[in-house]
Amino acid sequence: MASVASSTVFASSLPHHRATTRAPPTPPRIPRRARLPGRSVVSCLPKRGSEKLVVTRASDEEGPPEPAGQGRGGGRAWPSLDASSCGLALAAAAGVLMLQGSQQALAGTEFMGMQDVVGDLGDISTGFASAFLLIFFSELGDRTFFIAALLAARNSGAIIFLGTFGALAVMTIISVVLGRAFHYVDGIIPFSFGGTDFPVDDFLAACLLVYYGVTTLLDAASGDEEKMNEEQEEAELAVSKFLGNGAGIISAASTIASTFVLVFIAEWGDKSFFSTIALAAASSPLGVIAGSLAGHAVATLIAVLGGSLLGTFLSEKIVAYIGGSLFLAFAAVTLVEIVNS
């Protein structure tokens, strides 16, 4: 009886035990997201009882995809932006703005630097006109002029022109570089006079132009035939040592090289060399280079085509008067600019 009673009690208590047992929790349903066909969607849900994220991946095979751009209830599903995405977007926008600002600043700096080196259009035109007139009338009747004329009488005119103009072009570039270097040194180490910065380079350039103008006018006014023919005699002496007949490619190259060396040595330290330095120190270097090259080209062309015929139309004394007057005129213009500045 005791065993039957105990089994009865155990049987009666079993349903009560099952009723009080709690069922295991069901995992939350993963919401569907709008996705494109063939693409998988990643959903991050926090795991119950921990801070870690459980990543589950739902593919298109689990069910038919919903129409793109719609969520539950037919509404439009807008993409969610987290803090990291917003930060990256702001950083990218700031980087683009900074890059554009730096490019504009760099372009402005380069423009200012080029304007300081080259000068504006007004300075270029003034430098071109000054250099052309000064070099042209300085080279007419000069030693280089007679060298080109005498060489052209014995060789091909085109070959002599190439050698002569090449040497004068190199000499012009060297003169302009020296003049601009002196100009920049004066800007780095300014000389103060009366509380203001005094342009030493412009003043020395004006003094150099005055010197050559006065000496040229004195030589023209003296009327000394020996002084007037000195340049031609020196040219004949230099040409007497010249070799080459300009025939053939090798001989033509040798003639051009010999002419280049001869004219370069004769032009080094000449009045046109120092006058170009003076103009480059006070004017636009681009205008001075262009004007000097144009003046050398025209004067050399006249010498090659018929330098001996120049005396029949224009005497050396008149050329000297014109050249000396131009030297003094450009010196006066430079001094006026110094006073006005």
From Swiss-Prot:
- Give the keywords, sorted: Chloroplast, Membrane, Plastid, Transit peptide, Transmembrane, Transmembrane helix
An example Gene Ontology biological process: Golgi calcium ion transport
Keyword Nucleotide-binding part of the UniProt annotation: no
Cite the record's Low complexity compositional bias ranges: 1-13
A GO CC term assigned to this protein in UniProt: chloroplast thylakoid membrane
Transmembrane annotation, as ranges = 79-99, 117-137, 158-178, 203-223, 246-266, 286-306, 318-338
Q: What is its main location?
A: plastid
> Per UniProt, what is the membrane topology?
Multi-pass membrane protein
Q: Which Gene Ontology terms cover its molecular function?
A: calcium ion transmembrane transporter activity; manganese ion transmembrane transporter activity
Signal peptide position in this chain? none
The domain of life is Eukaryota
Q: List the disulfide bonds.
A: none
- InterPro entries, alphabetically? GDT1-like
Question: Region annotation Disordered: residue ranges?
Answer: 1-41, 54-76
- Name its cellular compartments: Plastid, Chloroplast membrane
Q: Mind telling me where the transit peptide is?
A: 1-57
Pfam families listed in its UniProt record? GDT1
Q: Which family does it belong to?
A: Belongs to the GDT1 family.
Could you tell me which PANTHER family the record lists for this protein? PROTEIN PAM71, CHLOROPLASTIC, TRANSMEMBRANE PROTEIN HTP-1 RELATED
> What name does the UniProt record give this protein?
GDT1-like protein 1, chloroplastic
